[in-house]
């Protein structure tokens, strides 16, 4: 009988931990939806896939329409190219600036639309549920 009680205590503790984890995840998921990331500018608008020309990207993080200061934003190209720095901190107006270097187009990988993803790494409290935005940059062939 004591073995059964001991087993039930362990099982009950595991259920409580799982429910607690789910509650924390749900809290962070709802909280992440209150943050909005928007692309403010991409310069130049039609970058060349030459592997050298930098593309300046500026994003803004807001919460309920107000700028969010001091959050770490992380940007990564999903299908080609590199970032000068992946992680930037938002300023007092909620802005973060990045420099993206497109890949060099070739016969095997012609110029195409590149998708970049930016995350707000600082919006979660308990579990990592990041606010995120995917956006595209159309690359043109280098001459």
Features from the language model and the residues they span:
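The feature marks long extracellular or luminal low-complexity segments
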Residues: 2-143
């Amino acid at each position: 009988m004591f073995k059964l009680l001991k087993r039930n205590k362990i099982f009950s503790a595991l259920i409580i931990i799982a429910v607690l984890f789910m509650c924390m995840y749900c809290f962070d998921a709802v909280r992440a939806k209150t943050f909005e990331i928007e692309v403010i500018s991409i310069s130049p608008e039609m970058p060349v896939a030459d592997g050298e020309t930098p593309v300046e990207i500026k994003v803004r993080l807001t919460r309920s329409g107000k700028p969010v200061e001091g959050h770490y934003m992380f940007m990564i190209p999903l299908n080609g190219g590199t970032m000068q720095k992946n992680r930037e901190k938002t300023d007092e107006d909620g802005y973060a600036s990045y420099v993206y270097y497109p890949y060099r187009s070739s016969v095997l990988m012609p110029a195409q639309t590149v998708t970049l993803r930016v995350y707000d790494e600082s919006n979660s409290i308990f579990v990592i549920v990041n606010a995120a935005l995917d956006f595209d940059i159309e690359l043109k062939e280098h001459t």
